[in-house]
Amino acid sequence: MLKLTDITWLYHHLPMRFSLTVERGEQVAILGPSGAGKSTLLNLIAGFLTPASGSLTIDGVDHTTMPPSRRPVSMLFQENNLFSHLTVAQNIGLGLNPGLKLNAVQQGKMHAIARQMGIDNLMARLPGELSGGQRQRVALARCLVREQPILLLDEPFSALDPALRQEMLTLVSTSCQQQKMTLLMVSHSVEDAARIATRSVVVADGRIAWQGMTNELLSGKASASALLGITG
């Protein structure tokens, strides 16, 4: 479904190079030390960075140089990027039409995803009137309403308390299963990864140093466990 072949990004003339295959509907965690290249990997997939070489295909179609707006990808960041002067409904609606001129079908999709996120009673509010968790639900709803086959998460819940973070991770996992979306999630927490991703990829020094079962990483028996400070 998603295939990266020697996708290379030059960071201060030092190459970060990634090869990775992710199947449709798979939920994969991307782990590794700070500065290892995790966010760079997601940005290359999303199209926010243009690779120096290599190829990226989605469903067999070459997207290596495709602009972000034409890629079948949605991405959620730690900063939710909500527009403070727009209501919750309008912020979600941007995922369907940048001009916010929604037809009846689009209106129905918007309200359905709001109910799924548990924010249907907040549609008339502004982002400044919401809690941090509620704002991230709105941002997630805006991603999901686009119905793109790939969802990228760059630590969007790291600022939330543990209980709320677990709640959001469960919500993401359930939503991806319902929509048959492929999920790649950057995280610093192997425990968070284990909640939703059976497979993990460990990035170190701009390379994929290891990939395999998340539980193996948690056990401390994987060759990359030490990179994450996990001992058996």
Curated annotation (Swiss-Prot):
Molecular function via GO: ABC-type thiamine transporter activity; ATP binding; ATP hydrolysis activity; thiamine transmembrane transporter activity
InterPro entries: AAA+_ATPase (IPR003593), ABC_SmlMolc_Importer (IPR050093), ABC_transporter-like_ATP-bd (IPR003439), ABC_transporter-like_CS (IPR017871), P-loop_NTPase (IPR027417), Thiamine_ABC_ThiQ (IPR005968)
Bilayer topology annotation: Peripheral membrane protein
Transmembrane helix among keywords: no
Residues at which ATP binds: 32-39
Gene Ontology CC entries for this record: ATP-binding cassette (ABC) transporter complex, substrate-binding subunit-containing; membrane
Keyword tRNA-binding on entry: no
Lineage: superkingdom: Bacteria
Protein keywords: ATP-binding, Cell inner membrane, Cell membrane, Membrane, Nucleotide-binding, Translocase, Transport
A Pfam family of this chain: ABC_tran
Subunit description: The complex is composed of two ATP-binding proteins (ThiQ), two transmembrane proteins (ThiP) and a solute-binding protein (ThiB).
Recorded family membership: Belongs to the ABC transporter superfamily. Thiamine importer (TC 3.A.1.19.1) family.
Protein name per the record: Thiamine import ATP-binding protein ThiQ
Natural source organism: Escherichia coli (strain K12)
Organism classification: Bacteria, Pseudomonadati, Pseudomonadota, Gammaproteobacteria, Enterobacterales
